[in-house]
């Protein structure tokens, strides 16, 4: 009975979307560099499906765009790896 109630309660809800927070990456684990006074990161992050973004500091990469709720299909900087163009 309880499984019927759960499946009924789930009807009409949006499909589950996997997201995470992180520094959005260009190819080769490179950062999108930014200026703290610019809204460029918020725009970049939203264009890639995140809810928001801002300019932060990523150790080893410098200033970089950080995104909130970025879809899993969009790459983020891998910790411990340098940009290798």
From Swiss-Prot:
A GO molecular-function descriptor: sodium channel inhibitor activity
Signal peptide: 1-18
Keyword terms of this UniProt record: Disulfide bond, Ion channel impairing toxin, Neurotoxin, Secreted, Signal, Toxin, Voltage-gated sodium channel impairing toxin
Disulfide partners: 30-83, 34-55, 41-65, 45-67
Residue ranges of domain LCN-type CS-alpha/beta in the record: 20-84
Origin superkingdom: Eukaryota
CDD domains in the record: neurotoxins_LC_scorpion (cd23106)
Tissue-wise expression: Expressed by the venom gland.
Primary location class: secreted
Gene Ontology CC annotation, any one: extracellular region
One biological process term in Gene Ontology: defense response
Intracellular or extracellular location(s): Secreted
Written domain comment of the UniProt record: Has the structural arrangement of an alpha-helix connected to antiparallel beta-sheets by disulfide bonds (CS-alpha/beta).
Its biological purpose: Alpha toxins bind voltage-independently at site-3 of sodium channels (Nav) and inhibit the inactivation of the activated channels, thereby blocking neuronal transmission. This toxin is active only on insects.
Family: Belongs to the long (4 C-C) scorpion toxin superfamily. Sodium channel inhibitor family. Alpha subfamily.
Name of the protein in its database record: Alpha-insect toxin Bot14
